[in-house]
Amino acid sequence: MRSSLVAAVVLFLTLPVLGQGGGVTADGWQARLDSSRGDVNELSFMSMSDGFHVTTGPHAIFWNSANTGSGTYTASATFMQTKPSSHPNSYGLFIGGRDLDGDGQAYTYFLIRESGEFLVKKRMGGDTEDVTPGWASHAAVNGLENGQQRNTLSVEVGASNVRFLSNGTEVASVPKAGLSVDGIAGVRFSH
């Protein structure tokens, strides 16, 4: 049986303004920064009527432990960037999250950026590895238009492959072996 999680979540991304932040205020959600030198209060992740509003800061993942998947499943979210950035920021989904607040953290992530490019990577502890060969352009990834960007990202975990889709179109498909796929699903923002 195929299940779906993180469905119909709309995230609104804005860029940081000095003094903004406040950390994670959405009920049930947690965050982890890539760097131990960062401060979660430099960013903002809060509930709003249609989903969540995120103001980026340090590179971070956000998750709710209730959003888990195993076997075959789909994780999906719609992202809207509301302001252009002065440099390449990225955001997207992660799946297979394990030990997210520990030294053995592991997950697979699918990111896009306003240039219309995508990237798939995996994290194992403090190390990351490209799953796809670097940032790549794809017509299915909407770029910035009139200062905004909107994309629905999905990760479909099948019996032997994992498909990464933007707006319903596959941008990559890779073997499931070697990826972290069973576990928590959430979102990632890189600034």
Regions found by a protein language model. Name each.
Residues 20-41:
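Extracellular carbohydrate-recognition regions
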Residues 126-152:
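Short, aromatic/His-centered strand-loop micro-motif at the edge of beta-sheets
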Residues 14-16:
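N-terminal signal peptide c-region/cleavage motif recognized by signal peptidases
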Residues 60-68, 138-145, 187:
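Beta-strand-rich interaction surfaces with strong enrichment in secreted/lumenal proteins
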Residues 56-128:
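Secretory/extracellular carbohydrate-interaction modules
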Residues 41-61:
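Short carbohydrate-recognition loop motifs
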Residues 174-191:
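Flexible glycan-contacting loops in extracellular carbohydrate-active proteins
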Residues 77, 145-175:
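Carbohydrate-binding surfaces in secreted/extracellular proteins
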